[in-house]
């Protein structure tokens, strides 16, 4: 029997507000433990929360970007559960009346668009962080307690681990474009829980689901889901029951481990938060937020295709990061041809950044430097192979292309007499290959070009080398 996966994702995004959701404490990451706390976020008796308006604005902005209906009236609720990192014994969240509902995101898979519905986006406070010491003691850092958190809940529309990763990437790109979340999975500012079940292909009923926690990279989203889907199918085929539970992804072993039984909503005993008035979002406020919305990834992809004549694939790569798309456009404004600039970014620049685990914001190379390098190629000062060497040196040192070419003596050889001399040297060393070429094996042209480039240390003009070899060998 064939099975299909049914996947829904719950994504928690920490909002880039300067202060926490219900108090004035800083949200800065990396401070000394328990230095960014106050009686409000520590849940001391008698304190009252005051809602951070910017957190509401960011949530509404996200809802609009994800095609949601914005609730004119929403309400906070207390979610009751006991855990060491929750000082009040409850979390202020939203339950029955969230800020945003009924939205969707579109992902592109194998050239086909897939719509993933978004059930709701609600606002809540984050919990603290448990730190487990090797000595056997556990500590709690409450700095994160009360940091504004947006929970984005998808419908169970995702059908494969690949789709789940694409959805996550798209969602993170939108959050970064909006400037509401930095999307850092490693630091925990973007966290993902996955609900997954399997069912026979063609069935419309849902299977028993498990929730997977501790997924902190796009690669692990795929790997965790792949493992869990296989585990569930194996249980079914062995006649065993799947237990509704929360499981922890272990990246070291590549497996999911049972953590606890999965809670239902009634286990949390939700009730309206008595210390906060309902949130009212007026049409005027929504219109004001709409006017401040930036160009989003999908809109930018469409524009890059129309304005610059780029293929869909190139446009998608260049718009994954807002800063990367801006780097590309700056280079084009400075005179670079769009496709040429795109190729250098996608092949060389991204390769070097990935090797160092950096993003474009950490890159010291400027768009003008790439444009100047391309000009040297087009003028015939250097060839493309040499240009790759120059580009890498530019990336490492920050020097201009012209300075590197001058210092290293990389100027392209376009003097016929010098190239002819090199060709004759190759012919004298390889008489058998010359004879084979003259007998019709013209595919050997690549061999001769390679040998000439070797003698000239890659500096000969490849086009001229090609032309002269044909001319001389045909004599």
Swiss-Prot record:
Q: Is Nucleotide-binding among this UniProt entry's keywords?
A: yes
The enzyme's main class, written as a single word, is ligase
Matches recorded under InterPro entries? Asn/Gln-tRNA_amidoTrfase_suB/E (IPR017959), Asn/Gln-tRNA_Trfase_suB/E_cat (IPR006075), Asn/Gln_amidotransferase (IPR018027), Asn/Gln_tRNA_amidoTrase-B-like (IPR003789), GatB (IPR004413), GatB_C_1 (IPR042114), GatB_Yqey_C_2 (IPR023168), Gln-tRNA_amidoTrfase_suB_CS (IPR017958)
Named from the GO MF annotations, one term is:
asparaginyl-tRNA synthase (glutamine-hydrolyzing) activity
Q: Which residues form a coiled coil?
A: none
Q: What is this protein called?
A: Aspartyl/glutamyl-tRNA(Asn/Gln) amidotransferase subunit B
Q: Which UniProt keywords apply?
A: ATP-binding, Ligase, Nucleotide-binding, Protein biosynthesis
The chemistry this enzyme catalyses reads:
L-glutamyl-tRNA(Gln) + L-glutamine + ATP + H2O = L-glutaminyl-tRNA(Gln) + L-glutamate + ADP + phosphate + H(+); L-aspartyl-tRNA(Asn) + L-glutamine + ATP + H2O = L-asparaginyl-tRNA(Asn) + L-glutamate + ADP + phosphate + 2 H(+)
EC numbers: 6.3.5.-
The organism encoding this protein is: Thermodesulfovibrio yellowstonii (strain ATCC 51303 / DSM 11347 / YP87)
The subunit structure is:
Heterotrimer of A, B and C subunits.
For this protein, the record's PANTHER family field holds: GLUTAMYL-TRNA GLN AMIDOTRANSFERASE SUBUNIT B MITOCHONDRIAL AND PROKARYOTIC PET112-RELATED, GLUTAMYL-TRNA(GLN) AMIDOTRANSFERASE SUBUNIT B, MITOCHONDRIAL
Gene3D superfamilies linked to this entry: 1.10.10.410, GatB domain, N-terminal subdomain
Q: Which GO biological-process labels does this protein carry?
A: glutaminyl-tRNAGln biosynthesis via transamidation; translation
Keyword Ligase listed? The answer is yes
Instruction: Describe the function of this protein.
Output: Allows the formation of correctly charged Asn-tRNA(Asn) or Gln-tRNA(Gln) through the transamidation of misacylated Asp-tRNA(Asn) or Glu-tRNA(Gln) in organisms which lack either or both of asparaginyl-tRNA or glutaminyl-tRNA synthetases. The reaction takes place in the presence of glutamine and ATP through an activated phospho-Asp-tRNA(Asn) or phospho-Glu-tRNA(Gln).
Q: Which family is annotated? A: Belongs to the GatB/GatE family. GatB subfamily.
């Amino acid at each position: 029997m064939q099975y299909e996966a049914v996947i829904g994702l719950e994504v928690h995004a920490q909002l880039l507000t300067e202060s926490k959701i219900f108090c004035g404490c800083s949200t800065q990451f990396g401070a000394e433990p328990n230095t960014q706390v106050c009686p409000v976020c520590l849940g001391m008796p008698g304190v009252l929360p005051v809602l951070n308006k910017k957190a509401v604005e960011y949530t509404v902005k996200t809802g609009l970007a994800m095609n949601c209906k914005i609730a004119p009236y929403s309400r906070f609720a207390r979610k009751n559960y006991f855990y060491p990192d929750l000082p009040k014994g409850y979390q202020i969240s939203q339950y029955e009346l969230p800020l945003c509902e009924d939205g969707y995101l579109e992902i592109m898979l194998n050239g086909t668009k897939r719509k993933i519905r978004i059930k709701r986006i609600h606002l809540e406070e984050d919990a603290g962080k448990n730190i487990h010491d090797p000595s056997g003691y556990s500590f709690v850092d409450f700095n994160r307690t009360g940091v504004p958190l947006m929970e984005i809940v998808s419908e169970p529309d995702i059908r494969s681990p690949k789709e789940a990763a694409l959805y996550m990437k798209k969602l993170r790109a939108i959050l970064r474009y909006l400037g509401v979340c930095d999307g850092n999975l490693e630091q925990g500012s973007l966290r993902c829980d996955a609900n997954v079940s399997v069912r026979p292909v063609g069935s419309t009923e849902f299977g028993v689901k498990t929730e997977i926690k501790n997924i902190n990279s796009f690669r692990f989203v795929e790997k965790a889901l792949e493992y869990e889907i296989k585990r569930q199918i194996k249980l079914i085929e062995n006649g065993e029951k799947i237990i509704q539970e929360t499981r922890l992804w272990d990246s070291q072993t590549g497996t999911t481990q049972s953590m606890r039984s999965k809670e239902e909503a009634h286990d949390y005993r939700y009730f309206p938060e008595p210390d906060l008035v309902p949130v009212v979002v007026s049409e005027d406020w929504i219109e004001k937020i709409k006017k401040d919305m930036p160009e989003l990834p999908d809109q930018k992809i469409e524009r890059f295709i129309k304005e610059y004549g780029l293929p869909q694939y190139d446009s998608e790569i260049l718009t994954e990061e807002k800063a990367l798309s801006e780097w590309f456009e700056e280079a084009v404004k400075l005179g670079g041809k769009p496709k040429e600039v795109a190729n250098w970014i996608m092949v060389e620049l991204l390769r070097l950044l990935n090797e160092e685990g950096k993003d474009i914001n950490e890159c010291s190379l400027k768009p003008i430097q790439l444009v100047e390098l391309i000009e040297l190629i087009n003028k015939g000062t250097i060839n493309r192979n040499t240009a790759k060497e120059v580009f890498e040196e530019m990336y490492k040192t920050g020097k201009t292309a012209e300075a590197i070419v001058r210092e290293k003596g990389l100027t392209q050889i376009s003097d016929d007499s010098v190239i002819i001399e090199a060709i004759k040297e190759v012919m004298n060393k390889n008489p058998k290959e010359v004879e084979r070429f003259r007998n019709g094996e013209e595919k050997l042209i690549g061999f001769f070009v390679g040998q000439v480039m070797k003698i000239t240390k890659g500096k000969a003009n490849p086009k001229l080398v090609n032309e002269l070899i044909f001319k001389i060998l045909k004599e």
